[in-house]
Amino acid sequence: MIELKNISVTFQQKKQEIQAVQDVSLTIDKGDIYGIVGYSGAGKSTLVRVINLLQRPTAGTVIINKENILTFSKKELRQQRKKIGMIFQHFNLMKERTIFSNIDFSLKYSGLSKSERRQKISHLLELVGLSEKRDAYPSQLSGGQKQRVAIARALANDPEILLCDEATSALDPKTTGQILALLKKLNQELNLTIVLITHEMQVVKEICNKVAVMENGCVVESNDIVSIFSQPQQPLTKDFIRTATHIDQALTTILEHPKLADLDKNQELIEFSYVGDQTNEPLIAQLYSQYQVYTNILYGNVEIVQNVPIGHLIVVLSGDEAQRQQALTYLAKQGVRTNVLKTYQQTKQKQNLQVI
């Protein structure tokens, strides 16, 4: 449905060229909730504005429904933009107008009669759960309610695509969850394609089925959400995953604890990652019964991503080196990814440094 081909965006700042987006190619299918995640300055907001040509690319092609919209006339582009709604971190509501009037403003040139507009606005308010607020003013609403109004306004012209630029960044965690649930509902009920810009991997995990990770204007990794969470390839992606699964907090606690992180001879501190049916397998029991390797679980969790369980364990493996190696080989054959976090030799080196 949306194809971005070799998109680059360059800004001229004084005498310096700044490349905000560098040679990015993405394909977003109809019905996707596609997340684009990255830290501030990664280029994600610039990229999403290319989709509706609020930002024209310096180079590349923008294909929507098999048409290159870069070739559209001004009139054709106006019609195209009606099919693309957009919401932002800041709600941009007109404070002197009621909620009803804020949405009605978007229908000003729709060709609908006053009665038809009234009926449509009532339906939109019902869709976003704000029917009782139609005569209220923005100042009387909470942040979450204001974003619901912004969503209703963005849907006024029956768009096929909804662009969400940091739409939950100004909201508390509970309200964020409610807005994400609403977006997921709209995606399912309206077959709405959603492109979600965020710096929070937790947001992506909640509703996206695909994700691209951006850094310094480039997409460093993209895949379906389960593959990204279960088999991240790039260091930045791994960092984002850890923040969304709280593994980084657990690992920091373990490594900084004087007893938990100290290993004896024939011990290793290891992280296991597994996905899908592997979460139901008694793998830890198998390590002892087959290889006489003891497993001390220091931390574990299971995340549900797109209805697929993804598990993580941080453990201390105990056994002679050959047995541990056989156990790790067995786990690899079962599809479990292993990452050696610390060895006895590293513990010993640290102790020697402390003595010195």
From Swiss-Prot:
PANTHER family: AMINO ACID IMPORT ATP-BINDING PROTEIN (PTHR43166), METHIONINE IMPORT ATP-BINDING PROTEIN METN (PTHR43166:SF30). ATP binds at residues 38-45. Residues 2-241 form the ABC transporter domain. Belongs to the ABC transporter superfamily. Methionine importer (TC 3.A.1.24) family. Disulfide bonds: none annotated. Keywords: Amino-acid transport, ATP-binding, Cell membrane, Membrane, Nucleotide-binding, Translocase, Transport. It catalyses: L-methionine(out) + ATP + H2O = L-methionine(in) + ADP + phosphate + H(+); D-methionine(out) + ATP + H2O = D-methionine(in) + ADP + phosphate + H(+). The complex is composed of two ATP-binding proteins (MetN), two transmembrane proteins (MetI) and a solute-binding protein (MetQ). It is a peripheral membrane protein. InterPro entries: AAA+_ATPase, ABC_transporter-like_ATP-bd, ABC_transporter-like_CS, ACT-like_dom_sf, MetN_ABC, MetN_ABC_transporter-like, NIL_domain, P-loop_NTPase. One of its GO terms (cellular component) is plasma membrane. This is Methionine import ATP-binding protein MetN 1. One of its GO terms (molecular function) is ATP hydrolysis activity. Transmembrane segments: none annotated. It is an enzyme of class 7 (translocase). It is found in: Cell membrane. Its EC number is 7.4.2.11. It holds the Pfam family ABC_tran.
